[in-house]
């Protein structure tokens, strides 16, 4: 492909993105890119020609036949959570930035439909190439987890096309707990227990209520901590959307425990989710999503979770909520 102006990571990324187009779209795009000078024998030939004759990744993505929705879905498959109303030129920039940041990484392939239970992908932390590094980078773990969790959950929204993977109880420990606090026209707190119930309640947010949760993964929106017992806590804040409307903000705490039977795999032990509708905030203000608790709050929360029983955990959550710390989610 000596004619192509694409880097290796751009080449692989565009190849995966083109996998979201059907055969007719691929053939039509090939005609456009090559000015009908190439007559491909099959889909593989057409993709090869498209990549070879594209002068740059941006030129290819700007083609009218590469629709905005296709780029959006591709980014979702890579765990990159973008608000649904994002314009095409901004989506292109997100894709270019993603490819530029990881030239040495093997990009995720666009997923095939899941048909068997054993094919379901659990959250796995990417293993560093440096095998000597025994310490877990919890900040990186938190970022990877959020990309995976929100990308998978948001992809279940029927307005965004086919899901990128199968959502279900397999991602949670069987005794997982969800505390869901939401403040819209009135305040409500609900508790859910068990992997099946928790996974269904979270699924209903995007599949039935059509919400889109967009996490803020900068230093203010994401905080992580760990305990000697192996529990990892991830605190994240972000905005809540439905279509082109921003409805409010959210704060969420996850408790993760490594699965001892599958290498580098973590499952969710508990979730505290707080959603605040715009109507519950000061008029005309929508603050930048940020986690309002500190590292010490997470570590203190740990000690209760890992040592005490369910009743004491709930008591700790209530105390934190009353005191105004970040554990109020």
From Swiss-Prot:
Organism whose genome encodes this protein: Homo sapiens (Human)
Higher taxonomy: Eukaryota, Metazoa, Chordata, Craniata, Vertebrata
Keyword Ligase assigned: no
Protein function: May be involved in apoptosis regulation.
Cellular component GO terms held in the UniProt record: nucleus
Domain of life of the native organism: Eukaryota
Annotated GO biological process: apoptotic process; positive regulation of apoptotic process
Coiled-coil intervals: none
InterPro entries from the UniProt entry: NTF2-like_dom_sf (IPR032710), UPF_C3orf38 (IPR026698)
Keywords on record: Acetylation, Apoptosis
Gene designation per UniProt: C3orf38
Protein name, entry field: Uncharacterized protein C3orf38
């Amino acid at each position: 492909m000596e004619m192509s102006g694409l880097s290796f990571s751009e080449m692989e990324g565009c190849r995966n993105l083109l996998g979201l187009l059907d055969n007719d779209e691929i053939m039509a795009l090939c005609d456009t890119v090559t000015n009908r000078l190439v007559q491909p024998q099959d889909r593989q030939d057409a993709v090869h020609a498209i990549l070879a004759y594209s002068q740059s990744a941006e030129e290819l993505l700007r083609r009218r036949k590469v629709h905005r929705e296709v780029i959006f879905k591709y980014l979702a498959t890579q765990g990159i959570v973008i608000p649904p109303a994002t314009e095409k030129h901004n989506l292109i920039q997100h894709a270019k930035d993603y490819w530029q940041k990881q030239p040495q990484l093997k990009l995720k392939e666009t997923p095939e439909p899941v048909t068997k239970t054993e094919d379901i992908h659990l959250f796995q932390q990417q293993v560093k190439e440096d095998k000597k590094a025994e310490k877990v980078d919890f900040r990186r773990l938190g970022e990877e987890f959020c990309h995976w969790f929100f990308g998978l959950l948001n992809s279940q929204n029927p307005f965004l096309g086919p899901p990128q993977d199968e959502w279900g109880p397999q991602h949670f420990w069987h005794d997982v707990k969800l505390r869901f606090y939401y403040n819209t026209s009135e305040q409500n707190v609900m508790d859910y227990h068990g992997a099946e119930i928790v996974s269904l309640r979270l699924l209903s947010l995007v599949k039935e209520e059509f919400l889109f949760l967009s996490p803020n993964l900068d230093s203010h929106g994401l905080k992580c901590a760990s305990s000697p017992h192996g529990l990892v806590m991830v605190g994240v804040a972000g905005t809540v959307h439905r279509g082109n409307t921003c409805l409010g903000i959210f704060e969420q705490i996850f408790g993760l425990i490594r699965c001892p039977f599958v290498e580098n795999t973590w499952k969710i032990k508990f979730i505290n989710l707080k959603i605040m509708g715009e109507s519950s905030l000061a008029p005309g203000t929508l603050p930048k999503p940020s986690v309002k608790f500190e590292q010490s709050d997470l570590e203190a929360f740990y000690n209760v979770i890992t040592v005490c029983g369910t009743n004491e955990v709930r008591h700790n959550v209530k105390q934190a909520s009353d005191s105004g710390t970040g554990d109020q989610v």
